[in-house]
């Protein structure tokens, strides 16, 4: 039962796990924020925003597009494998809406985390514990729940969600450590 729950959790999240890794490999190009900063805006209590970049150089259109495409393609490939695996473990097929939501949601979560990092004065690559490990999970799940509600409810049962929120930080730290060891990242987180 536990092994099947873990297998379903990993299978269902693979289209969300892969995009940020592919974005690192395919990155470069024009930053999403175009190099812009938030000018100082104030309200009656003082400074609301700072002059840091909106997102930073690490969030590019190319990385976002390639990452999203990779997640969707992976979901379509998993759909081809699913009939062979489903007899052993009850893994789901991915409707296209779920595939896109998982992949793009992962990218969007990472983009939102970058925005939060800049607002809290963290530089590109700086650690942001908790947010770094779960940003993409929360947004990809939320977006999937909105655009593929029936599939989401059938797939992401409470035990599967628990497995995702326990396993993801471990997988995230492990894969980032490997990417750092191979020189693909400047930081091990």
From Swiss-Prot:
Indicate the enzyme's highest-level EC class.
transferase
Keyword vocabulary terms for this entry: Cell membrane, Lipid biosynthesis, Lipid metabolism, Magnesium, Membrane, Phospholipid biosynthesis, Phospholipid metabolism, Transferase, Transmembrane, Transmembrane helix
Per the record, the pathway is: Membrane lipid metabolism; glycerophospholipid metabolism
- Look up the domain of life of the source: Archaea
Transmembrane feature ranges: 6-26, 71-91, 96-116, 125-145, 162-184
The protein's required cofactor(s) are namely: Mg(2+)
Q: Name one Pfam family in it.
A: CarS-like
Choose any GO biological process term that the UniProt entry carries and state it. glycerophospholipid biosynthetic process
- For whether the record's keyword set contains Glycoprotein, the answer is no
Broad class of the protein's primary localization: membrane
Query: Could you state a single Gene Ontology molecular function term?
Result: CDP-2,3-bis-(O-geranylgeranyl)-sn-glycerol synthase activity
What is the reaction catalyzed?
Answer: 2,3-bis-O-(geranylgeranyl)-sn-glycerol 1-phosphate + CTP + H(+) = CDP-2,3-bis-O-(geranylgeranyl)-sn-glycerol + diphosphate
Membrane topology according to the record: Multi-pass membrane protein
User: What HAMAP family does the record point to?
Assistant: CDP_archaeol_synth
Write out the similarity annotation.
Belongs to the CDP-archaeol synthase family.
- Its biological function? Catalyzes the formation of CDP-2,3-bis-(O-geranylgeranyl)-sn-glycerol (CDP-archaeol) from 2,3-bis-(O-geranylgeranyl)-sn-glycerol 1-phosphate (DGGGP) and CTP. This reaction is the third ether-bond-formation step in the biosynthesis of archaeal membrane lipids.
What protein name applies here?
Answer: CDP-archaeol synthase
* Native source organism of the sequence: Natronomonas pharaonis (strain ATCC 35678 / DSM 2160 / CIP 103997 / JCM 8858 / NBRC 14720 / NCIMB 2260 / Gabara) (Halobacterium pharaonis)
